[in-house]
């Protein structure tokens, strides 16, 4: 049905994932995007805070995922000589130029795509829903999991930010969210 959400492919439930991530201490230095986040934080986020556009001591967040299409097919090439020997359907290993990408469902366009899921937490009480914390995940990441990964990383990397309320859509409709 057009506009419907894809079923989660994760093997772990929200109920299992939430306490695991809540008790994980993420270190920005260990993240592949660490230097990019530091640049974002210093040049954009802190500027928004200093101008009074975002209030980190009483933050209302909205969160949602959006597709980031990187190609129309998997980017891979053979590392074997099978094609030279006339074997076209070998099962040999391949080299993937974007190994952290995969296939996901875009419910707003009603199609599959190859790439990432950008989960964005924004300041819903700011004039323009200014971004607070973005996180790229493989395209197959369901929003219910994308939020948890993004939220708990945000808490680790921005410890002085106090979240007062969170606005999420129906993809996040799981009892552990309400209980948290």
At which residue positions do the language-model features occur?
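Polybasic low-complexity intrinsically disordered regions
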Residues: 2-170, 175-178
């Amino acid at each position: 049905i057009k506009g419907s959400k894809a079923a989660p492919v994760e093997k772990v439930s929200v109920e299992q994932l939430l306490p695991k991530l809540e008790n994980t201490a993420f270190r920005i230095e260990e993240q592949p995007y660490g230097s990019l986040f530091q640049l974002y934080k210093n040049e954009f986020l802190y500027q928004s805070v200093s101008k009074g556009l975002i209030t980190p001591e009483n933050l209302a967040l909205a969160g949602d995922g959006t597709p980031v299409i990187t190609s129309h097919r998997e980017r891979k090439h053979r590392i074997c000589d099978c094609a030279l020997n006339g074997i076209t359907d070998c099962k040999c290993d391949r080299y993937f130029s974007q190994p952290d990408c995969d296939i996901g469902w875009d419910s707003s366009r009603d199609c599959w795509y190859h790439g990432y899921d950008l989960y964005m937490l924004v300041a819903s009480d700011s004039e323009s829903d200014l971004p607070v914390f973005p996180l790229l995940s493989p395209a197959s990441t369901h929003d219910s999991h994308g939020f948890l990964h993004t939220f708990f990383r945000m808490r680790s990397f921005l410890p002085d930010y106090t979240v007062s309320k969170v606005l999420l859509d129906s993809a996040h409709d799981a009892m552990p969210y309400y209980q948290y």
